[in-house]
Amino acid sequence: MAGDVGGRSCTDAELLLHPELLSQEFLLLTLEQKNIAVENDVRVNKDNLTDLYVQHAIPLPQRDLPKNRWGKMMEKKREHHEGKNDTKRGSAVDGLRKRPLIVFDGSSTSTSIKVKKTENGADDRLKPPAQTGSTSDSLRKSPNSSSRIAPLVLYSSLPMNNKMEHNNNDTKQNHDLTHRKSPSGPVKSPPLSPVGTTPVKLKRAAPKEEAEATNHLKPPEAKRKIQHVTWP
């Protein structure tokens, strides 16, 4: 038996939960099938039939028990039975759950996080690589090191200083030679002479090896002097 209530179709089970929607004949038939005695004055009034149906014939969760000793006893049994069903349902859900349920009560807000240190883990990767062959690091570490190690560190830096001084001397000599070959001052060009006259004597520049030897012997003032060309 299916009905239409408020433009919505209702199944038989839904109609059994709402006895006010059932007809008076259906209520009487249901009470007779349940072997519930119905008096003559109750048969006439539909409200009395619905109350009797709610007390005895409606499905158990929605049934209103009478307020007597039997009704109180049945209510206690119902509550005990519902509590058992809840515990069984909760244990089944916990068994299906992979992880336990975490409940935050708000009492502890600051928690300390512990990180397990590994022997050869991420800590070694975070360390900077050791720098080798740098004189600055060796000089920086020398005050903290012992007195025996300090002279060795200073001696190791001496060859580098000697090389730097030698390179500076070479560049200075090359600079002086270029200044000698191309003097910065203006040089007077000789007038053109006719063919057949006496040859002009020019002072030729010394070779490179002789120039280096003379540069070592001469004082620095002689290097900077401009050589003038002499004419006969």
Curated annotation (Swiss-Prot):
Gene Ontology CC annotation, any one: tRNA-splicing ligase complex
Record's family? Answer: Belongs to the ashwin family.
Q: Where does it primarily localize?
A: nucleus
Q: Where is the composition biased (Polar residues)?
A: 131-148
How does the record describe its quaternary structure?
Component of the tRNA-splicing ligase complex.
Q: List locations, semicolon-separated.
A: Nucleus
Q: Which residues carry this modification: Phosphoserine?
A: S112, S182, S184, S189, S193
Query: What Gene Ontology biological process does one annotation of this record name?
Result: embryonic morphogenesis
What are the protein's UniProt keywords?
Nucleus, Phosphoprotein
Q: Where is this region: Disordered?
A: 74-99, 113-232
* A Pfam entry, by short name: Ashwin
- What is the native source organism of this protein? Rattus norvegicus
Q: List residues modified as Phosphothreonine.
A: T197, T198
- Report the superkingdom from the record: Eukaryota
For bias kind Basic and acidic residues, which ranges apply?
74-97, 116-127, 163-179, 206-224
Q: What is this protein called?
A: Ashwin
Q: Which InterPro entries match?
A: Ashwin
